[in-house]
Amino acid sequence: MQLYTSAANIPHPDKSHRGGEDGFFLTTPSISSVGIADGVGGWANQNINPKLFADDLMEYTKQSIESGVREPVIALDEAYNMVEQTGSCTAVVGIMERDGLFSVANIGDSGFIVIRQHEILIKSKEQQHGFNFPYQLGKVEGKDGKFYEHGDDRPQDCETYQLKLHEGDIVVFGSDGLFDNIWDNALLEEINSMDCESPEKMANSLAEMAFNEAGRKDNWIPFTERALEQGAWGLKERNDPAFLGGKMDDITVVVAIVV
């Protein structure tokens, strides 16, 4: 079996001049791997392009996998050691073997969902130090020109998953711009309504759906629900009119179909 994949990316309108802050990679079906990284936007306040760290981490992860590494945490660790950029990002990386064994490493608030026979089989969990403070991999440049680990999180802190995929399973990977704006049941309904074998159409449809929800002013989204659950912003009531509206962000979606 192999993963037949396609990606869609819609940058935050205010960040489109630099292509947003997400990075991602796809490999050929014979290698069957996927990765998404979400650059932490706060670095822009220090005149650092957050996308560069995310892009490099994904490129080096792809290179590691293409060289023969088949464990996502090891691939991420090799890539992290190679990055020479100041910045940080969340990341999710998945690899499937020919027998369907699917391994994923996730750090932070990007993630994935597996859909089987029109139902959600599994969804990854976020890793947060606190509300809207996801685990992240980072580095900073020292005065000596070398790059050093930044923050407390490392590839070994990834949440890991392993399961057997079946032919026809659909895996949706996304940055938080997808999962913060789209409820799981709405995502599932959108995928099921398409009933097609085109990951490109599915990825584009989900990205556009998330972007539309992000721009609305009258919706209650998963991100705000988590704020309510965690007591953030002084929020005490669901659908409080003062807190309605989407969360504009970079949106990256990868859809993989098992064939």
Question: Where would I find each of the regions flagged by the language model?
Answer:
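PP2C/PPM-type serine/threonine phosphatase catalytic domain
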Residues: 1-259
